[in-house]
């Protein structure tokens, strides 16, 4: 089964998405997501100029060989642009292979390991009362795992805040220049335990409670914070400190039993190796679009399972519905599954990407259609051209550039 076509589409039905479409001589079509928030055109160019021409004429069934060819053959290995492009190719080829087999991808991977995929939602608010109201809404929807973020008194901007009540959180801003946001670690550390106390006092411990620190703390600050919130029994604290220096997680681990989740910015198993091998984290948050697709994620998950580290894949709506569809198939199969992030998509986005997944009482299922179970409406996508947008930049109150 030969590859006869490979096309790249950049569309913005509310968010910029990079879509790869691979076509075979049998007429089968595979879809992959190559979206890299704020750097979409870099990945699109990498695909168009380098990978797509080298796909033509290859056997679509030889997924592993193609993966290795693009990874090892590039010499300049890893990195978010390279790995996002490889991820899209890999997803599309698995989509084709499952369609050729006439089965949903999760069956091809080895079948379901569970009845459904537990997903966690995002709750947000500028005050604790706003968060409690949003939490109640998501609890009523059936979510069993809920992330909470709240505006911090005295700070004009706080990570995770939506631009209005009832709106989804959207960090990127349109235009050619990123928004600059202020950050105060001291105010955050003083306030955030009060948020968890309010949530647990009102709703109890029925739901899993998650929180994202978004790389903002130093190791010793993260250790102190993790210790201070143990009574609230968080499912995890996410990205407590930048993970470039992975040894620093030993300090955090030595001081708290609050579970740690890391990895959304990782793009290969080598980024995860030390954290997993030394059991410095509990959940690995690598994502289908940035860590090598199905093939890359399988390697990471298999390695993590040796150390009882579970998956908790990154899944915001700045990754396209194609990524989410692939993630659900992977999550349904992978033995050491933990939870899957799910922010939801607008109707406009889902019109461009018709899907077969379902949500019921806090769990999702990818559906039974062959392949990934998702489509791409090219004509409709063409109505939504690329619209430049960038993630924010953070500064401390004295003007020092900080980790966003």
Swiss-Prot record:
The keyword Lyase applies. This is D-galactonate dehydratase family member Ent638_1932. PROSITE patterns: MR_MLE_1 (PS00908), MR_MLE_2 (PS00909). One of its GO terms (biological process) is amino acid catabolic process. Belongs to the mandelate racemase/muconate lactonizing enzyme family. GalD subfamily. Mg(2+) binds at residues 212, 238, 264. Keywords: Lyase, Magnesium, Metal-binding. The record marks 316 as: Important for activity and substrate specificity. Its EC number is 4.2.1.-, 4.2.1.8. Its cofactor is Mg(2+). Binds 1 Mg(2+) ion per subunit. One of its GO terms (molecular function) is magnesium ion binding. CDD domains: RspA.
